[in-house]
Amino acid sequence: MPVKSDRWIRRMALEHGMIEPFVDHQVRKGVISYGLTSYGYDMRVTNHFKVFTNVYNALVDPKKFDPRSFVDIEADYVDIPPNSFALAQSLEYFRIPRTVSCIVIGKSSYARCGIIINVTPLEPEWEGHVTIEISNTTPLPARIYAHEGIGQVLFLESDEPCEVSYADKKGKYQGQTGIVLPRIDP
């Protein structure tokens, strides 16, 4: 599965709407970088965040997740409490081709400050805004900036189409917009 280049990413974004909105160069001055890179795309985070809090002394259970465990924040930045996390969404909407799977890795500017992101793979024919988990591994509050880079998407193309894509199996996060909490199929 070779990683795809900037030329391929640009063509797929402009001709097939793979990334919208699409920035065809890397923006770096005065911000956490975002936009097209040599072999990836640095996606941005919106100004909508859900910051984890344990106000109700809830158990964190992915099968019975209590949405009251989060505080909704809309701002130009968010400060994540020490040893806690927040959920956010990508500014970009992605449409992944059937022969492609994507891995998202964190930005070094954040990682060097103890801020780690986690995103599950973007599967073939998945589309939507990416829900991003942002962990503050430090004993101090950590700041995340809206409308700036949060993670790099790497596009890996297979030599043949998959038998069953995310769209084929009607994945539970297909077409998601906003910050989507855990879902369990009934």
Swiss-Prot record:
CDD domains: trimeric_dUTPase. GO terms for molecular function: dCTP deaminase activity; nucleotide binding. The keyword tRNA-binding does not apply. InterPro entries: dCTP_deaminase, dUTPase-like_sf, dUTPase_trimeric. Its EC number is 3.5.4.13. This is dCTP deaminase. Pathway: Pyrimidine metabolism; dUMP biosynthesis; dUMP from dCTP (dUTP route): step 1/2. The lineage of its organism: Bacteria, Bacillati, Chloroflexota, Chloroflexia, Chloroflexales. NCBIfam families: dCTP_deam. It comes from Chloroflexus aggregans (strain MD-66 / DSM 9485). Homotrimer.
